[in-house]
Amino acid sequence: MERQHSALAMPFASPNRTARVAILLSTYNGATYLSEQLESLIAQTEQDWVIHASDDGSTDATLEILYQYQRRLGDDRLYIHAGPRQGFAANFLSALKRTKDQADYFAFCDQDDLWEADKLERGLAWASAHPTSTPLLYCSRTRLIDSTGQLIGFSPLFRRPPSFANALVQSIAGGNTMLFNAAAAQLLSLTPFQVPIISHDWWSYIIVTGCGGRVHYDEYPAINYRQHGNNLIGSNSSVRDRLVRLQRMLKGTFRQWNDVNLEAVSHFRQHLTHENQRILELFGSARRAPLYRKLSLISQSGVYRQTLPGNLGLVAASLIQRL
C-alpha cells in the first residue's frame, strides 16, 4: 500500500558510500537479546550492508557484545559510535546525521528484535523501482514475539493509504520496520537536534509524506518485534489497548503529542508541499477553533486515522479539547 505525492527533488551525493544499506542500530543495555538480533542481520539475503551501532551509555555487556561482533565482521562492516544519551529518538537521529552520506539506503534497527531474512530485500525491491530523487520510505506490519521468541500476535493490519493527513494524527509502523533512501535521509537529517520529537518513526512518516515523498506500507510482517518487560507495546488491537488509548486521550497525552509534532513540523514548513501546508494550517486551526467550528475544520483538513474506532476517537478528542 502506498500513496504517491508530488516529488520533492532533494539533491544528494554519497562520496563516502561504504555500502548499499546502512543499518542504524540503537543500543542501550540490550545485552540479553542483542546477539540474536545481530545474527538475524548477518543472515539477510541482501548482503551489501554495514551496521552503525550507536550506544547510548550501556552499563551491561552490550558494548562487549558489539566489539565481539566487530572482530568477527571487521571494523569496516560494524562501526560503533557513542550516542548522545538523550533518549532513543535522539540516538537514532544522531546516527542518521552521522551516516547520511555513506549509503544509498538506511534502515532503523532496534536491539532486541529478529529480522526476517528477506527484510532488507523486500524494502529494496520496492524502493529501487522508484526515482532516487524522491524521498522513499518502506515500512511494514510486524509479528509480535515473546521473550523466548514465540509468536504471540501481529501488529494491526492497516488498509487506508499512507499520507500526511494520516501521519499528522497517527503513526502506522514502527521504526524497526523502516527502510528509506538517501533523499529521505538527507531530508530527515535537517531535523535540528534541539527540536523535540515524540519518536523517530512517527517523525519519519510525517516528514516524508509532508515533503512530497512516497511511503509504502507492506502488509507482510518483515520483522519479529519482541515484547518483554522493558518493551511492551501489545498488539494495539485488543480491548485493553483501546482502553489505554482512550485513557491517554482523556488525560491529554494525545494533545501533548500533537503539540510537540506540530512545533517540530513548523521547522519544515518551507519543505512541505503546498497541499500539505494547507492541511497543516487547517488542522492547526481546528485545534484552536471554538467548539462549533472544530468538526467542520477537521473535515476540511482531511486528517484521518486508519480505522473507524480511531476516527471516532479523533472526533471525540476534538469535541473534548483533547486534540
Language-model features, listed with the residues they occupy:
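C-terminal subregions of glycosyltransferases and related glycan-biosynthesis enzymes
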Residues: 193, 197, 203, 224-323
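Nucleotide-sugar donor-binding/catalytic module of glycosyltransferases
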Residues: 2-237, 319-322
